[in-house]
């Protein structure tokens, strides 16, 4: 399932485009940060239904149920499921899509960078993809 999630992230063109920092409206920036941190908090509470509520219709369609989604995150993204710390970094635009970079430290002290693609829907901002970035000495 992790491969599906990463494939989705790659299919939207992250690797093909040029990343440009975004000067998002303050309200949008705060809302984007909130959906990511709120989803992580829901995972920490094992509230998969709440975590699933932050996912886009595309992600909901891929996984079908909060339980399937939660199981995928537990197996494929353990650093998101049980982080030691979370730091929101820059918001960027790549090929017209918004990507929020997040730095997560896992319980063992390893640092991970993730890119969250977010989309605006009638329900507000939602997470449409997450890509775990390759390790490159982050935090060293």
Predicted regions and their residues:
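Positively charged n-region of N-terminal signal peptides that target proteins for export
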Residues: 1-7
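Bacterial N-terminal signal peptides
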Residues: 7-17
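Alpha-helical transmembrane segments and their juxtamembrane interfaces
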Residues: 12-13, 57, 125
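Short, low-complexity N-terminal intrinsically disordered segments enriched in polar/charged residues
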Residues: 19-45
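Short solvent-exposed beta->alpha transition segments
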Residues: 30-34, 38, 48-95
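Exposed beta-sheet edge and beta->alpha loop/turn motif
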Residues: 90-140
């Amino acid at each position: 399932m992790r491969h599906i999630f990463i494939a989705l992230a790659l299919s939207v063109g992250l690797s093909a485009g040029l990343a440009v920092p975004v000067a998002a409206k303050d309200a949008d920036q705060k809302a984007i940060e909130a959906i990511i941190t709120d989803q992580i908090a829901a995972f920490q509470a094992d509230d998969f239904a709440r975590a699933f509520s932050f996912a886009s219709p595309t992600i909901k369609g891929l996984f079908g149920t909060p339980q399937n989604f939660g199981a995928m995150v537990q197996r494929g993204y353990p650093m998101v499921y049980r982080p030691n710390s979370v730091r929101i970094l820059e918001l960027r635009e790549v090929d017209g899509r918004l990507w929020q970079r997040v730095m997560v430290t896992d319980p063992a002290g390893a640092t991970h960078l993730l890119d969250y693609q977010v989309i605006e829907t009638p329900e507000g901002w939602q997470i449409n993809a997450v890509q775990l970035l390759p390790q490159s000495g982050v935090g060293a």
